[in-house]
């Protein structure tokens, strides 16, 4: 049995409350954040029947596999360390010449992908507010484009054109968005 350590589970919430990792979508500087937005999510994953199911799988698995560093960090405890493995998310380079130097001698194109119902989990708007302040000081040098709800192929084309992608604040590890951007030579913040 292999247990995937991916995002929401009662152990991750427990570890986040204990300050591991140092910041997350539920805790920042050892203080709860976004708790109202996270209330239903945390409730669902900390119900007794969910905890029993998680416990049965976690304690009876042959291996635990984390795909993000922060999940690996949460599970790196004496009770799980010997069975814990880290397998990062894959990065696919779309075509050989896709990674290139961008933004040379022209306006820097910044792409901000927003999932309105999930931004409290990601924190992209927090980063974007800093980019906006830089753009206000240098309006002729930075162009910010906010997008949401576009088809995947269109989004990949936008990544090809972007110089910078604003991605997740609360993740220690590059997400699939970040990896797709970096494969195209796009800087990720």
Segments from the language model and where they lie:
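Helix-loop-beta element that forms the nucleotide-linked donor phosphate-binding surface
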Residues: 55-60, 64-66, 71-91
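Short, solvent-exposed beta-strand-terminating loops
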Residues: 2-27, 96, 189
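A short, aliphatic-rich alpha-helical micro-motif
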Residues: 58, 159-160, 182
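Acidic donor-binding loop of glycosyltransferase active sites
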Residues: 160-173, 186-187
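Glycosyltransferases and closely related glycan-assembly transferases
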Residues: 1-4, 15-16, 56, 60, ...
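Membrane-proximal helix-turn-helix segments that form the acceptor-binding/catalytic region
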Residues: 23-64
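Conserved catalytic-core segment of nucleotide-activated headgroup transferases in glycan assembly
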Residues: 73-74, 83-152
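Short alpha-helical segment that forms part of, or immediately flanks, the ligand-binding pocket
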Residues: 156, 178-183
